[in-house]
């Protein structure tokens, strides 16, 4: 960790998608997302397997604990908080959407750490459904509680596909800037129009074609086709466009589920699910990021993660709050992976 780096605490860190995007210094689809001046000094998550993956990939280990029981007085002082508070009760996939569910109140742990640590900036992520709950009253209530801790708060629906992620994933991003910081925040502008979206074929592993474990048996296909009462909508994928949103349920995917599947042979009705590595690429994880767990755990962690590439742009967009000025437009600061260049000094103080 550099002496003058900006210190970050990550709540609900999961396997580390947000953290990787915040730090930067990774490659994805022939592009290098340059190291940003952030360092994670504290990370916590309740999921033991997610923490196992996190600690396999990051220098600073995450703590496996219930964030509700963490004494924030005892963690390091930080410049920024990041956290994708659990969102099952807010998800459009969840038919219950019970706002009295305890999981719907975990954002209050963000409020609690803001009250104690007073960071200059915080970034939160949640599902699109949060905007729709009680006709927008829930997101406004959450924003008001953040504002009451002394922050100027903005939220916006961000489409990951517009930032080079090969997936039509939409997430609510909430950004707070402490009121005494002289910085007017703006969300990053979309970089790609629809005709330039990254297609799914760029992340599909041809080697998986020979691995039978990812294919649905013909018996399973016939059974799912005959279960008319359970049929929802088969989301087979067009390889020439971005993937539909992947979820944490990919290990249980069927041709009738809401998770995308690949139709390998239309004539023979041969289907397969994504491999964990393909799912990770769809989320914009670099191949260097490893998942040292079984497939079901990997699918869950990947589906719950924040796309690192999307988070890189969000993290870059708040640097002005810390006195940094970009040398040029952010999109010009991404170096082609194989181009031999010296390390870019992306941000200057002053």
Regions found by a protein language model. Name each.
Residues 84, 121, 273-276:
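Short aromatic/basic micro-patch
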Residues 2-118, 128-132, 137-140:
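Core alpha/beta nucleotide-donor-binding catalytic domains of modification enzymes
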Residues 15, 85-89, 191, 250, ...:
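Short, small-residue-rich loop/turn micro-motifs
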Residues 26, 85, 131-134, 146, ...:
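A generic secondary-structure signal for well-formed alpha-helical elements
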Residues 85-86, 119, 166, 286, ...:
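Proline-centered helix-kink/hinge sites
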Residues 70-80, 88-245:
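Class I S-adenosyl-L-methionine
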């Amino acid at each position: 960790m550099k002496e003058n780096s900006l210190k970050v605490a990550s709540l609900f860190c999961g396997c580390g998608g947000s953290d990787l995007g915040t730090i930067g210094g990774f490659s994805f689809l022939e592009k290098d997302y340059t190291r940003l001046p952030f360092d994670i000094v504290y990370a916590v998550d309740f999921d033991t397997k997610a923490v196992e993956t996190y600690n396999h990939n990051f220098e600073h280990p995450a703590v496996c604990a219930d964030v509700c029981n963490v004494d924030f007085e005892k963690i390091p002082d930080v410049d920024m908080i990041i956290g994708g508070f659990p969102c099952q009760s807010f998800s459009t996939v969840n038919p219950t959407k019970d706002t009295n569910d305890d999981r719907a109140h975990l954002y209050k742990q963000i409020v609690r750490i803001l009250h104690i640590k007073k960071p200059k900036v915080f970034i939160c992520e949640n599902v699109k459904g949060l905007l729709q709950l009680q006709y927008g009253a829930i997101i406004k209530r959450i924003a008001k509680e953040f504002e009451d801790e002394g922050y100027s708060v903005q939220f916006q629906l961000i489409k990951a596909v517009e930032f080079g992620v090969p997936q039509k994933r939409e997430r609510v991003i909430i950004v707070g800037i402490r009121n005494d910081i002289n910085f007017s925040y703006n969300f990053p502008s979309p970089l790609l129009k629809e005709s330039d979206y990254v297609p799914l074929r760029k992340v599909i592993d041809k080697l998986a074609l020979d691995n039978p474990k990812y294919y649905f048996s013909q018996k399973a296909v016939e059974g799912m086709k005959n279960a008319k009462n359970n049929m929802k909508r088969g989301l087979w994928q067009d390889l020439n466009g971005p993937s539909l949103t992947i979820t944490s349920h990919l290990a249980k995917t069927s041709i009738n589920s809401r998770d995308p599947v690949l139709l390998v042979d239309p004539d023979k009705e041969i289907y397969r699910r994504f491999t964990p590595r393909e799912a990770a690429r769809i989320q914009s994880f670099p191949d260097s990021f490893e998942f040292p767990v079984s497939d079901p755990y990997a699918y869950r962690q990947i589906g719950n993660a924040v796309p690192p590439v999307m988070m890189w742009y969000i993290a870059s967009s708040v640097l002005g709050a810390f006195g940094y000025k970009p040398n040029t437009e952010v999109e010009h600061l991404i170096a082609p992976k194989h181009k031999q260049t010296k390390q870019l000094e992306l941000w200057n103080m002053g």
